């Protein structure tokens, strides 16, 4: 087995709000991110990227109390997803940019993983549908 056999992997350390991007055995980049609030924790486990969207629409998650009465938000500066969405195999959870840079480094979301917009764009360009995503506590 060679380093290239290992492929691309994202590891998110939920409690320390860090996202690590590996290409093979090599750590390419580490990012500070925002993860879920205690009332809306980012799920732990092994997932994978299932969708990639440029300039996504934001839709209120069905059945979410916090989103009741909210309207969809089109792409643009007011969109809470920024310019990129990487949906993972956990309902309504993804990795995305955020216009709220002050939230980075904190537990501040409703379960998603927020990144600075430029960093989400960087990651988006390097991962594929099927890329593994491991979300661990520490």
Q: Language model features by range: what are they?
A:
Residues 1-5, 37-40, 44, 57, ...:
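Exported/periplasmic cell-wall-interacting domains
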Residues 1-56:
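Cell wall/extracellular polymer interaction/catalysis modules
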């Amino acid at each position: 087995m060679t380093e290239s056999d290992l492929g691309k992997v994202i590891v998110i350390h939920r409690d320390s709000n860090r996202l690590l991007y590996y290409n093979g055995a090599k750590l390419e980049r580490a990012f500070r991110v925002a993860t879920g609030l205690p009332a809306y924790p980012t799920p732990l486990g092994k997932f994978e990227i299932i969708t990639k969207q440029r300039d996504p629409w934001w839709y209120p998650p069905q059945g979410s109390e916090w989103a009741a009465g909210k309207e969809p938000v089109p792409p643009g500066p007011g969109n809470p997803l920024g310019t990129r969405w990487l949906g993972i195999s956990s309902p309504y959870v993804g990795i995305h940019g955020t216009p709220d840079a002050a939230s980075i480094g904190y537990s501040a979301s409703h379960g998603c993983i927020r990144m600075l917009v430029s960093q989400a764009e960087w990651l988006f360009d390097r991962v594929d549908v099927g890329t593994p995503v491991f979300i661990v506590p520490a």
